[in-house]
Amino acid sequence: MAPYSEEYEILKENTKPVSPQAAPREYTVVYSVVLIFVYWHIGALYGLYLGFTSAKWATIIFNYLIYVSGGFAITAGSHRLWSHRAFKAKLPLQILLMLLQTMSCQKSVLNWVRDHRLHHMYCDTDADPYNSTRGIFYSHIGWLMVKKHPEVIRKGRTIDMSDLENNPVLKFQKKFYPILVTLMAFILPALIPVIFWQESLNIAHHVSLVHLVVGSHMTFAINSIAHAFGSKPCDKTISPTQSISLSLVTFGEGYHNYHHVFPFDYRVAELGNNYLNLTTNFIDFFAWIGWAYDLKYASPDMVAKRAKRTGDGTDLWGRAIEHADIQAKRVHPS
């Protein structure tokens, strides 16, 4: 029986699960994570109250800048640069993105990327860390509160991370992550307002939790809402969707249907909506000064052909293509 068992394991290892998949499983709650999330959210609500009643304007502006900077570090850095290699970055930009990503407190880049590459390779299956087949709560935040599914662990070992494991910037972050995240995400955001404009430590700390919680939910929303509500202009057979409103609050990450079809595109969206796609503008700026280069994108012809073949008949704004054609003729009559 031994040879059969080994052969079965090899076959099992190389078999890609078919989505949607959510086999019955036991959930083992990680209570330490639950308690951290409870504290963060209660503290953030208190911080929001302080922001409206007691905090200095400098503290509010300071935390807003941290929120925006951390958001760009996740969308441009963890996601488009390191997860999908959609563009390349010179050392100064890599260091900047790594430090700001640490400030967002969303795992080290290497852990973030492994989970995200798993998500793309095994989307909506038991090997997907945030499997949307298990419901919107699970894909949003619940997956972080329980131990990983055995398939996530098993398939995670097969994900190729060789392009990042020898990156000195990411190796440094991984090695010193507990120290760095404590300093960047908690100590500095609390102490800087106290030292520079005499904010109270209580207010500075709790207001800083607001940007931490809101920034986390910004990322979580792509894993959950962008797999539940919206249009599917590129591929109607998959769960990822496109949402203009979600793009507004996620710096351009809401064009998720497009992204799952063309994950290599640094824009994560078609041309024509870049003024909503702040991350694309962020990358374009650093390309202009020479810190970002080799920006990859799908050609308009490639996008049009795929949309015609598998799309749901909507355009990049979520409108029916027939309606879009009528509007175009009104603006540009032949």
Give the predicted meaning of each segment.
Residues 257-259, 294-295:
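Conserved active-site loop/cleft motifs that coordinate metal ions or position small ligands
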Residues 207-245, 249-250:
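Alpha-helical transmembrane anchor segments
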Residues 161-169, 232-255, 261-262:
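Active-site-proximal inter-transmembrane loops
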Residues 1-220, 225, 265-334:
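Non-catalytic, topology-defining segments of multipass membrane proteins
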